Amino acid sequence: MMQQQKPGKPKKINRIDKIKRLQINRSRRPDINQTVPSPLFYVRIVVTWLGMVSLDAMTGFRFELLWPTWLMIRAAAESIQMRNQHCVTTIANPTAARFSVLFICVTATSDLICYLFIPIRMLIFLATTYVWISLYYHTQGGFLRSLATVYGGERLQSWPIVFITCFIVIFELFLRIRSHPILISFFPNVAEYAGVSPVWPRSLNAFFGAHSIGYPVILITVSMHYYFNEWKLRRKQCDVSNRNEQLFRILVEGLPAEYEGPKDYTSQQCLEDDLYYLDPPVQTLQPMQAIQAASATPPTSSKKNGIHKRNGDVTSSTTTSSRKKKHNGNSGFNSTPPNDKKKGKSIRDVDMDDGDDSDDDYSYRDTSSSTIEDQRRGGGISIIRFIFSSAAWLFSFVFESSTPSENSLSNQQIDDDEDYEDGDGDKKNGRTDSMTSTTKGRANTMPSTTRSQNNNNSQKQQKQSNGKSHHQHSSHQNNHQKSNGNSNGHARGFAAVRDSSHDTNASNETDIRSMSRELESLRSEISSRRSQEEDFKLQVSMHESNETRLSQQLSNMRLKVEQMEIKCSSIERHRESDKHQLEQAERKYADLLGKKAEIEATLSAERKARMEVTSKKYDVAEHQRERERQLESEIDKLRIELKSKDESNMRMESELHGLRNYKEENDIDSLNMELRFVRDKSHQMEESLAGENKLKQSLFKCLGDARDTIKSLERRVQEFQIKNGSSIGGGSSETLMNGRSSTEANNENDTTASDQSSPHQHSAMGSPVPFAKMPLSVNVSNRHGSPFNGKVSPIASIGSVLAAAGGPAPPDYMMAVGANVTATTGPVPQKQPRAGFHGISRYNEFTNIASGGEHRLFDTPASAISASAINGSNPEDDFLMNKGKFGAPSQPAARLA
């Protein structure tokens, strides 16, 4: 069986290949899940991490916080060099930021807010954790690519990312922030963990930590703003595209249809693959060529249902004559676009195309495998796209209703499918085993204009048939084939023969010429029938081969169905076992929830206790520093006191040394004797002063009694004068008046004398003290033979009054003092009293008497003067002259001698 080879076609270059050729100097990022990191990569990361931790332990400054600052400086330098004023910040490319004054001000404000309102420990923890995680994700291709790898990638690549992320967070939280004592065991000499770290590393850590948090926050905010604007732009483009499709549909419906088939309502650009639609229709082949082309064509038929273009992505949907069968595209008439073959092939399943021997099997397998691989790689990015698309759908559902263009498109597609489906065919892997579908597939490989002409010819033949069996059979075959080139030519010739025979039968003319012509026409018809028979034989053989092939495919499909049933049964068994395990797991989960509640209660109590313990541990260093400052201040005070004590000790030692020298140079016995003498003298003076005070009190008491007595006597005298009367009373009254005046004068003298007495005497009597520092003085003058000159003694005047009254006179002041001293010290030699004081023994040991009649109580007594006169010197003067530096005698040995 001869088959015509396909004419050579120029090889078309795919648009993707052209785009790849244009990307000469563009840097391209590696695809997700492309390579597995080598162990050397992890060794480098671990070495870098250990180096940074060691530097932090030695200096107290975290050098990893300088990395965001370095990124910002590098981005600024690149933006200045590129001078791209329309550069947009994205999460995937943060170095492409548009550095302006506003951007720098916003970044500085964000850093300042983080520095002021976040605690230092939390700030350093967040900054360090973010830097290490960001650095690791940066080496893995970016934050989004790492998340996509974790979600949709292989376990060999996702597990290291999860493990390293958890390790960084746990290490920063539980070892570097909360448990310095653990690191002290490894670094005992580090000042950072001992609690005495300097101030400047902590300040720098807080500063760069604030920048490490504030700068990424601004980048993410700007990126989200960019993505939101991009989403709004895409949404607007979608609305405009739907509106254009609606208008284009109205325009197409208003124009006359040039072919039978579904109408394309979708607007699309004129691309390289769309040039097919601008070419003129292909001419009909010769009958033999059509048969050979049909023999080379698989028994499938398809029609283009529509091309839907949205946002630059062109997708094609094809339907088969049975029920939306897939397009094969190997016909010789080139009735489908060039790229429809690959686009239709990419939808099939690889396992369902094992028995297909077409020319595009290998290309289909390549494209399908590459499509599956691309879908596997783009799993993580598709999640993000799905999130954005779901958000866009939600916004469109809330704010806008569905457009009528989409409803009209869906309804039109449903109508097209209903018009072109056949109830006899069954869809199995895009192929059918019926002869009708085969002939229809051959008919569908021709242009629409040829099909319309053939259909019209077949309708004319059916109308002009006269009931002959072979004519009806030929017309039925022509109507059943619909676009075969051989049948079309035979239909035209046979219609002309029928017309001529009908004319001859109608006119009843039996002409030899007409019969000869009819004979020739019958011969030509016989030859055409023979050629048609050969065509049918070829078709029968072709259908037999197709039947064998389809039977093989059916057996293969049955085997696959059996395998799928076995697999389904195994899956059902696994499902039952999974249900049983799930029930057990739920029971265990309920038990674990109860245990979890108990453990959480105990854990909360332990956490509180640990927090208290850790807070105390954290405050130990501060308490130690505070205690150290207090001890230093106390040490300074004690040093000052010690210095003063040393000075006083040196002074006392010098004095002690002087006293020892004085003790060695002088006699102690003579000093003790002089000290005893001074003590005795002071004791005597105290006793004499006490006696004088008592005497003065008794004297003032007697004075008061005497005044009362005088007043009573004056009253009696006045009464007596009133009784006696004249002369006698006058003389006596004068006498009494003179006596009274003298008595009053004496009383006044006594009062002035008492006013000049010592303050101790006034205070003893309860009178005010006029002069606090006046020396004690007593007036001892007496008119009646007193040995002292000056003022009159009150004792003498009182005695004279009492003598006149006939009573005994009170003792004299000096007599009382002398009696008191005599009682205490013993008999003392007395002087003889003058006349008027007979029988009264007096004692006066005071020699230094003032000229006005006053004497001092603490003067040297006469006995002491007499004792000193014997030796020829005054002992008090000798004592004052011989007194040394510290009150001791200067020359005790000479004194004793």
UniProtKB/Swiss-Prot annotation:
One cellular-component annotation, GO: rough endoplasmic reticulum membrane
Biased composition (Acidic residues): 351-361, 414-424
Comp. bias intervals (Low complexity): 452-467, 475-490
Keywords: Coiled coil, Endoplasmic reticulum, Membrane, Nucleus, Transmembrane, Transmembrane helix
Membrane topology qualifier: Multi-pass membrane protein
Coiled coil: 503-726
Residue ranges of the region described as Disordered: 291-375, 403-535, 724-770
Disruption phenotype: RNAi-mediated knockdown results in defective avoidance behavior in response to P.aeruginosa.
GO molecular function: microtubule binding
Primary subcellular site in the record, as a coarse category: endoplasmic reticulum
TM region(s), chain numbering: 113-133, 157-177, 181-201, 204-224, 379-399
Subcellular location: Rough endoplasmic reticulum membrane; Nucleus membrane
Taxonomy, superkingdom: Eukaryota
Tissue expression: Strong expression in many neurons, very weak expression is also detected in others tissues.
Biased composition (Basic and acidic residues): 510-535
Alphabetical list of InterPro entries matching this protein: Macoilin
GO biological process entries: chemotaxis; locomotion; neuronal signal transduction; thermotaxis
Biased composition (Polar residues): 291-304, 329-338, 403-413, 432-451, 734-761
Reported function: Plays a role in the regulation of neuronal activity. In AWA and AWC neurons, plays a role in regulating olfactory adaptation by controlling the forgetting sensory responses to odorants such as diacetyl and isoamyl alcohol. May play a role in regulating daf-7 expression in ASI neurons in response to bacterial small RNAs. In ASI neurons, promotes dauer formation in response to pheromones such as the ascarosides ascr#2 and ascr#3.
Name used for this protein in its record: Macoilin
